[in-house]
Amino acid sequence: MNPFILFFSGLLLGASLYFFHRRESRQFAALLKDKNARLEQEKRIVVEFMHNLAVAIGEGVPRKELYQRIAHTAVITTGAMSACIYEKNKSGRLQGVAVEGLFPPQRAIKQSKLKEGESRARFLETILTSETLEEGEGIVGQVAKTGKPVLVEDATVDPRVVLHKDDSLKSRSLVYAPLIHDDRSYGVLVVANPSNGLSFSQMDF
């Protein structure tokens, strides 16, 4: 073969490999930068979350309002569509005390009509705040009893999750987290259904 052709072929191959390597390096750098940016964002969210809680506690915010702030912040930080906090009372039972969004009740509900002028969110809040679970009952009770979080990636195939007929109350994916301070269990925080339509994963957990 003509030596000039071999030379230029080698030059072209070398240049191609060089630019391919540069492109891969740029893509890797971009991915790394994006990952670092996401980590920084998550760090800011956590810091802001803790700051807001510290401010609320310092201001002497009533417990129910504090729980409501936690539920609201949990929805924002996890990208969930709804959240609910179940507080553990003196008898060990779990009472719904704070709701954010259209949270699916953890028990089957009887279909009843909305009162005149009552919003759907208010209707569900009334149901959830009147919902009392026994310690050990369902996933909420299990988390309260063991102090260990539970991830339900696909709620549609998990027999522990109540499946509601109402589409707006269907559970797709949930994360249950115990509320513990100084080794004392105060209740359980549950976030439901990522707003992006996907499922929660171990990364969120």
Regions found by a protein language model. Name each.
Residues 6-59, 64:
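Signal-transmission linkers at sensory-effector interfaces
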Residues 49-57, 62-81, 85-86, 139:
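Amphipathic alpha-helical coiled-coil segments that mediate homodimerization
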Residues 84-131, 157:
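GAF sensory/regulatory domain recognition
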Residues 95, 126, 136-141, 145-173:
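Signal-transducing coupling segments at domain and membrane junctions
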Residues 162, 186, 192-205:
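Regulatory loop-to-helix N-cap segments in sensory/regulatory domains
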Residues 172-180:
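A short, aliphatic-rich beta-strand micro-motif
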